[in-house]
């Protein structure tokens, strides 16, 4: 073997290898022979799993498929990592900031040999290693309000710092792109729409010429050596695996928002079954917003399945279809869908179920909270307050606007939008505290609200930070709220109406966009989506200690968090579009923070 004493790198030695399956212990050494910790070691199949894709590129309804897991571990302080048994041929990728990615092919994995990770010295390549938040931290220096508005309105479908977005474009190209995104639903102010194209053209041209301006991302913690990440590829580049739930039956149910398909996944074996959500008579492609996705190359969105919740009474799953005025109910035992027509309201969004088996959900575009009483088979809607008469009028005209959008009229490009999105207050996340009260976050008004189901009384609370998106309650009845454009979460104590700010543990400071979060009540831990940082963040509530966990794929845009009974963390890569994800493959992600303990 060639010896390059002046090459900063890592020597990877294969210690053991079983026959017919890859069960290996790796040791990572530096050029001085000392152990090298915190190398991300990812094992992936040489070839993707062969599945039946005869239903327009997807598995036929009800037909069992067998996926193949990808496994990632991190080397410990001794430079070691263990890859558990797995049949078949695999490749291994070595990744560490500051080094070139290195792939080890199956033929080399069968030999007791050595590999070297070369140090990366090219400034452009070093910048390209860094996650989206490092790139977006360079945007709009000195224009904090504009930067937050841009990230809030242009960073909720996909990352703005991925390789697809940070490339050089002309102002004309940016103008065209922004107009299309506004048709998709972005509420970027009219002033920002006019100002940003030239600013973005100049900025990304400057960064392309000076990649050294892109700062380093969040340092990797020694805690990673205990962690593992398992990914199961599902769907394709045209899917959007938006939300999911860990069901009491042990399965994970994932909704493909763009293809109206529900995935039933066995997280232990990788076997899964797809159930196509059937459109109802009279449903149009695109639902009530038929013209919204006219430019998208492939979708089967009649309903737009969005958020999921399980009934503790019978295990049925309730799904919000954002492009219709209904709730969908799925019976995991009979594998059948039933529909409940709301009859009013627009854009059913996030859903939760209370202890009385009432289904609560936000109606994002009609400024309402909805409730479905399963026992009485009755819907009730609760109107949230408006900020002005003009906003009330705009919301009341929503049915008319929907018709225009359905006809393909670009009405969203014609109306004037102010900096606070008057007309679209957007009630978004929802949860229920242990005392039975319903809480929502209203994204564009910087407020949360409580609803007392016993009286119907609604109380609004202004948040000290901008853009509350999703919220969850902990075991003490406190609320945790992701503040999307602020790289922070708020804790709200209902008893005292006190807010406390917790900044996310990212570098550069203030650069992440927490789309959602969830509380592991048993372990008293908060887990937050690092939507812009290719990671997930854990806060130990008792100690206040944060830990950042990087994920294996670049452009991993996550929108939800769930937990397995043994404390593993579930996520899904849910970028819209999914072709922004590294290798254009969405996955169901299972993070075990204590795999080696």
Identify the role of each PLM range.
Residues 25-37, 56:
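Structural motif
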Residues 47-84:
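Short, acidic Ser/Thr/Gly-rich low-complexity loop/linker segments typical of extracellular
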Residues 91-105:
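A short, solvent-exposed loop/turn motif at the edges and junctions
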Residues 150-161, 196:
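The canonical Cys-X-X-Cys-His
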Residues 237-248, 281-312, 344-356, 388-434, ...:
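Beta-rich, blade/repeat-based domains predominating
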Residues 251-254, 316-319, 358-361, 437-440, ...:
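Conserved beta-propeller blade signature
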Residues 266-270, 331-335, 373-377, 452-456, ...:
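Short loop/turn segments that connect beta-strands within beta-propeller blades
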Residues 551, 558-597:
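Blade-level signature of beta-propeller repeat domains, shared across WD40, Kelch, NHL, RCC1
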């Amino acid at each position: 073997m060639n010896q390059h004493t002046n090459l900063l790198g890592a020597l990877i030695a294969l210690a053991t290898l079983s026959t017919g399956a890859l069960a290996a212990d790796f040791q990572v050494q530096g050029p001085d022979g000392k152990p090298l910790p915190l190398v991300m070691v990812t094992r992936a199949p040489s070839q993707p799993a062969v599945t039946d894709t005869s239903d327009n590129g997807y598995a036929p309804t009800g037909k069992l498929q067998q996926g193949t897991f990808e496994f990632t571990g991190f080397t410990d302080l001794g430079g070691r990592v263990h890859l558990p048994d797995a049949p078949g041929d695999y490749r291994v990728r070595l990744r560490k900031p500051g080094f070139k990615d290195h792939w080890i092919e199956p033929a080399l994995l069968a030999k007791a040999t050595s590999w070297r990770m070369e140090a990366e010295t090219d400034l452009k390549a070093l910048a390209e290693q860094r996650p989206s938040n490092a790139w977006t931290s360079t945007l709009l220096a000195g224009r904090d309000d504009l930067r937050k508005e841009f990230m809030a309105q242009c960073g909720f479908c996909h990352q703005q710092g991925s390789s697809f977005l940070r490339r050089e474009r002309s102002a004309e190209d940016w103008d065209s792109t922004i107009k299309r995104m506004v048709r998709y639903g972005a509420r970027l102010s009219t002033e920002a729409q006019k100002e940003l194209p030239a600013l973005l053209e100049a900025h990304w041209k400057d960064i392309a010429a000076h990649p050294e301006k892109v700062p380093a991302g969040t340092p990797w913690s020694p805690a990673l050596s205990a962690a593992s990440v398992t990914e199961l590829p599902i769907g394709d580049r045209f899917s959007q695996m938006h939300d999911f739930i860990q069901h009491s039956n042990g399965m994970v149910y994932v909704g493909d928002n763009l293809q109206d398909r529900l995935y039933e996944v066995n997280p232990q074996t990788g076997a899964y079954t797809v159930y196509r959500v059937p459109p109802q008579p009279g449903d149009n492609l695109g639902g009530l917003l038929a013209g919204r996705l006219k430019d998208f190359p492939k979708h089967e969105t009649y309903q737009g399945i969005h958020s999921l919740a399980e009934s503790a009474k019978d295990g049925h799953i309730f799904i919000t279809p954002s492009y219709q005025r209904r709730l969908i109910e799925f019976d995991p035992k009979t594998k059948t869908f039933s529909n409940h027509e709301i009859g009013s309201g627009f854009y059913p969004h996030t859903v939760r179920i209370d202890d009385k088996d009432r289904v609560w959900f936000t109606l994002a575009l009609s400024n309402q909270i909805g409730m479905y009483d399963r026992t009485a088979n009755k819907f009730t809607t609760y109107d949230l307050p408006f900020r002005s008469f003009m906003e009330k009028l705009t919301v009341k005209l929503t049915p008319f606007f929907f018709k225009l959008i359905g006809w393909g009229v670009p009405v969203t490009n014609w109306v004037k939008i102010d900096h606070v999105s008057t007309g679209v207050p957007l009630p978004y996340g929802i949860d229920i505290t242990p005392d039975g009260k319903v809480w929502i976050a209203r994204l564009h008004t910087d407020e949360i609200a409580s609803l007392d189901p016993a009286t119907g009384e609604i109380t609004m609370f202004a948040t000290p930070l901008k853009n509350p998106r999703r919220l969850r309650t902990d075991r003490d009845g406190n609320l945790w709220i992701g503040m999307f454009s602020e790289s922070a979460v708020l804790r709200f104590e209902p008893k005292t109406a006190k807010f406390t700010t917790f900044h996310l543990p990212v570098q550069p400071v203030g650069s992440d966009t927490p789309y959602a979060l969830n509380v592991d009540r048993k372990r008293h831990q908060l887990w937050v989506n690092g939507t812009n940082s290719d990671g997930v963040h854990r806060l130990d509530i008792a100690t206040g200690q944060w830990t950042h966990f990087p994920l294996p794929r670049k452009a991993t845009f996550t929108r939800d968090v769930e937990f397995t009974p043994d404390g593993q963390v579930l996520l899904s890569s849910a970028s819209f579009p999914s072709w922004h994800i590294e290798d254009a493959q969405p996955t169901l992600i299972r993070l075990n923070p204590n795999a080696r303990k």
